[in-house]
Amino acid sequence: MSDLQSIADRVEIEALRGEFTDAVMMRDYDRVASLFTPDAAWRMPNIPVELTGQEEIRAFGERVPRFVDYLVQTTHPGTIQMEGDTASGRAYICELIHPSDGSSELNYAIYHDRYRRTTDGWRFAERVYEIRYLDTSPLAGSAPPTADGAR
């Protein structure tokens, strides 16, 4: 593989991670599911949730609004190790979560990822969410009122 191909692969994987965060923030669960391979696993052991395949991932996402009023997720670049048509890496996450039960969460976490090149581009073969810091103190702020048609 040429150096140029390696650079292109890294850019595509970084774009995949950004697309995931955007899809989660926009509550676009069809798009979230499409970012995974058909046989992918998404594991969140601290919650605990384990999902296998695009349909389980989509269905979980569609349930999220029942127990989360809003969340803000930011993803920070991590590492990517290329291995031909597969790769592994880590992305660093900060989340503010306001569950519908009125509680609050601020966490810092790591996504441990495995990626696979497909005919549609790079996709997640596995995402494992590891919370490294959790603060359940009440959040001082809130989501602002939304304008008509805003998401």
Residue ranges and their predicted role:
Residues 1-38:
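Short, low-complexity N-terminal intrinsically disordered segments enriched in polar/charged residues
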Residues 10-18, 30-31, 85, 90-92, ...:
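Binding-site signature for planar aromatic cofactors or substrates
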Residues 29-94:
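A solvent-exposed, acidic/Ser-Thr-rich amphipathic alpha-helical stretch
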Residues 88, 108-138:
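Short beta-strand edge/turn micro-motifs at domain boundaries
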Residues 95-97, 130-131:
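Short, surface-exposed beta-strand-loop junctions and turns on beta-sheet-rich folds
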Residues 96-104:
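Short, cysteine-centered beta-strand-loop-beta hairpins and adjacent loop/turn segments enriched
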Residues 135-151:
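Acidic/histidine-enriched, glycine/proline-rich intrinsically disordered or flexible terminal extensions
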